[in-house]
Amino acid sequence: MRCPFCGNVDTQVKDSRPAEDNVAIRRRRFCPACGGRFTTYERVQLRDLVVVKSSGRREDFDRTKLERSIRIAMQKRPIEPERIDQMISGIVRRLESMGDTDIPSKVIGEIVMETLARIDTVAYVRFASVYKNFQAADDFDKFVSELRPGLVEE
């Protein structure tokens, strides 16, 4: 594996262990050229997914992009980082097992929202505000009121 610090291709694995409930392998690596240490994760990839945007544009699925958007929604929430990793792995496995390699971005967004709703409602609302492109406070108000249908509006 290429060293991210100096580009040397001869790095050494110093430690390997299971991660994310045994669906990934965490490897600590060392670069003898520059002394750099870094961590890599190895995961099973069932198939190469392609995201189909609403504009029709297609791009390769990027787990890092999915992870970034979920971590932004989960920022400063009392959720363990391992739980977030498990959630992301679960979403990716679900996408890979759908049977088609072309996945509409809308489907990905809905799966993420469905998953977040079960884990943390604040993160769910945060993600939804970006995904559904909220423009005003009324958009938040309407969305949150739909979360609590039993409440009577004043």
Curated annotation (Swiss-Prot):
From the UniProt record, give one GO term of the biological process aspect: negative regulation of DNA-templated transcription
Keywords, A to Z, come to:
ATP-binding, DNA-binding, Metal-binding, Nucleotide-binding, Repressor, Transcription, Transcription regulation, Zinc, Zinc-finger
The residue ranges of the ATP-cone domain are: 49-139
Q: Where are the zinc fingers (unnamed)?
A: 3-34
Q: How is the cofactor bound?
A: Binds 1 zinc ion.
* Transmembrane parts of this sequence: none
Name the source's superkingdom. Answer: Bacteria
**Required co-factors:** Zn(2+)
Q: Which GO terms describe its molecular function?
A: ATP binding; DNA binding; zinc ion binding
Which NCBIfam families does the record cross-reference, listed alphabetically?
Answer: transcriptional regulator NrdR (TIGR00244)
HAMAP family the UniProt entry points to: NrdR
Q: Which family does it belong to?
A: Belongs to the NrdR family.
User: So what does this one do?
Assistant: Negatively regulates transcription of bacterial ribonucleotide reductase nrd genes and operons by binding to NrdR-boxes.
Name listed for the protein in its UniProt record: Transcriptional repressor NrdR
